[in-house]
């Protein structure tokens, strides 16, 4: 007997568990491919042809992060890689990652990591920090 596992209904569509996994993975891929841009989670949900409220809930259930928070964490991870692995200035990195301003990037980075970007760069190079792939 074939049993269908139904997870949710969104925009009058029935999604099986495998379909949900696929939508979440598609969203994660799109976010990773666009880390140097600004992504609106509502537009991303529309692109995936699902409602934003459903997308936000299911994405958080699967990843532990709301879509916007997940994307912010991707950007911070990329910033860490660039700080340790390149000689680009903090200003260049903040611009590349599409932050509103260098000050905003600096403040957010310090709040999330406990280090300023320059402290992180220095510490990371001294200790050969490798960012874990948790996202």
Please name every model-derived segment.
Residues 1-2:
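Short, small-residue-biased leader/transition segments that mark boundaries at the very start
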Residues 25-33, 37-38, 42, 61-106, ...:
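Terminal helix-turn-helix DNA-binding modules in bacterial transcription factors
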Residues 14-21:
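Intrinsic-disorder/low-complexity linker and hinge segments
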Residues 47, 51-52, 100-101:
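Short coil turns linking two alpha-helices in DNA-binding domains
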Residues 10-13, 62-63:
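Short, Lys/Arg-enriched N-terminal segment that forms or immediately precedes the first helix
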């Amino acid at each position: 007997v074939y049993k269908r596992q139904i997870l949710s209904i969104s925009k009058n569509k029935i999604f099986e568990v495998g379909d949900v996994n696929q939508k979440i993975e598609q969203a994660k891929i799109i976010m990773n491919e666009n880390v140097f841009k600004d992504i609106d989670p509502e537009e991303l949900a529309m692109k995936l042809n699902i409602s934003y409220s459903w997308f936000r809930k299911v994405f958080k259930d699967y990843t532990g992060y709301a879509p916007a928070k997940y994307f912010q964490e991707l950007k911070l991870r990329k910033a860490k890689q660039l700080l340790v692995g390149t000689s680009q200035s903090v200003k260049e990195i903040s611009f590349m990652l599409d932050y509103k301003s260098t000050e905003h990037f600096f403040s957010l980075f310090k709040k999330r990591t406990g280090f300023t970007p320059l402290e992180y760069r220095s510490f990371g190079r001294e200790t050969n920090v490798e960012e874990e792939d948790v996202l």
